[in-house]
Design a protein with these regions (language model features):
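Short, flexible N-terminal segments of the mature chain
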Residues: 20-45
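Short, well-ordered, aromatic-rich surface patches in folded extracellular/luminal domains
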Residues: 1-20, 46-139
């Protein structure tokens, strides 16, 4: 049985000075089997302040996960740079074997990170959504 990525989650965190009521986290989750993406904004208390679900065409989901499986295997676990810019990102990928790969960073993209952003932004555009997520926060 081939081990496939079944779920991709990207969290962006604002680690700067802010009030607990401020939006300090964005979470994007893309599900392979359900053909959908869930976008959430959370405040400093961890309370979901907004949530949007976007349905994605099956062929686009397949293309996205095939791309991840081809490129993310060589990722290191840490792309943090010793810079205080006040933000951090974390990617988690769940596999059909129940393995979870976790990768984190700050001001630099992981390899092919810009292409991942392009896929996600196309899902948002195709879903006619107005959300503008930070994603990796590197742009």
């Amino acid at each position: 049985m081939i081990d496939k990525i079944t779920c991709f989650k990207l969290n962006w965190y604002d680690c700067g000075l802010c009030c607990a009521e401020d939006m300090v986290q964005e979470e994007i989750t893309v599900y392979r089997n359900n053909n959908l993406m869930v976008f959430k904004e959370l405040n400093g208390y961890g309370v979901v302040c907004s949530c949007e679900i976007i349905h994605i065409e099956s062929d686009k989901i397949t293309k996205f996960f095939d791309f991840l499986e081809q490129t993310c295997d060589e990722w290191e676990s840490d792309y943090k740079v010793a810079v205080c810019d006040g933000s951090e990102w974390k990617v988690r990928m769940w596999h059909s074997s129940h393995k979870v790969k976790t990768v984190c960073g700050t001001v630099e993209y992981p390899p092919n990170g810009k292409k991942i952003e392009k896929h996600i932004r196309s899902f948002i555009e195709d879903g006619k959504s107005l959300i503008e997520p930070k994603l990796f926060g590197c742009g």
